[in-house]
Amino acid sequence: MPNDLVVVKANSLIEANYRLSIDEIRILALTIGTMDPKSNQKIFDFTVADFVREFPEISQDNAYKQIQAAIKRIYDRSVKTEDKDRVTEFRWVSSRTYFKKEGRFRIAMTDEVMPYLTQLKGQFTQYQLKHIAYFNSVHSIRIYELITQYRSVGSREITVEKLKEWLQVENKYPRFNSLNQRVLEPAITEINEKSDLVVEVEQIKRGRTIHSLNFVIGSKKRTAQKIEEVAKRPVFPHKNKYGKFVKLDKQNPKMSNHEYGLWARDCLKILEDHYTDITKVTNEDLRNYWVFLAGNDSNRSKLGSKSDFLNELKKRGYKLVDCELVKI
């Protein structure tokens, strides 16, 4: 079995309604991770050793019984998808096999589920299995998949009602505080501690009621890089050292006063001494670069021209309006 297994699912399957235990989800994730997304193969074998290797917190002593019990339950599980025109319900697997004394299992996926797992040409989400390998909560995995769908966007807003439906707790936790304490907070903590994502949750009210949640999604790698760079860059000198009226003309930086020009020149030198690659410059410092270069035609940067910094911001989904960062 290959390392770094990748789970690929149609978005409609991620947003489907189904109830599975943590071990059932692990088995399906392991099975889907071994699939060739371009193939129609429906039968998959795996061993106890495979399962324990991919999910290290599983005890080798109890793994066989856990898998056997979970596969037995999966056989009776179904998934329900819904669109504007219809509701469809189908089973995950069509057969299950135990190879006695071999520590090996085989499951066959149903014809109905296969279009949601293979031959996908769009509207799908993928992630590495290792990023959910240490999760101990079904809710953590489901929320992880739901926000991974919107990872490139950077945020996803979900109504509380819809989230409860997806998490199969629509008949529990009538008070949001209970849902937050028992489901959301533990899941977000687990995602932040054990996966590749960093997630913050913003509560959106309608009147006095929490109506929806905005999941702000970041990558640990990018966040760590940004924090490291910001921490390392020396702070700019205080403007008071250059006079009482150090002012930027935001509509036309060239019209900024002389004191601002002196301050900007020294700040630009700090940036030049710190950065060696434009792709590693933080968004705020890309803005600073542009402003400092725009204020005086004699100012230069080894990283590029004003347009180069604007283009880098555009790649990241930002533009400058009156010298301020604005999301495109």
Curated annotation (Swiss-Prot):
Molecular function (GO) terms for this protein are: DNA-directed DNA polymerase activity
What GO terms in the biological process aspect are recorded for it? DNA replication initiation
Which InterPro entries did the record assign? Initiator_Rep_WH1 (IPR000525), WH-like_DNA-bd_sf (IPR036388), WH_DNA-bd_sf (IPR036390)
Q: Which family, according to the similarity comment?
A: Belongs to the initiator RepB protein family.
Q: What is the lineage of its organism?
A: Bacteria, Pseudomonadati, Pseudomonadota, Betaproteobacteria, Neisseriales
Keyword Lipid metabolism found? no
Q: What is this protein called?
A: Replication protein
| Alphabetic keyword roster | DNA replication, Plasmid
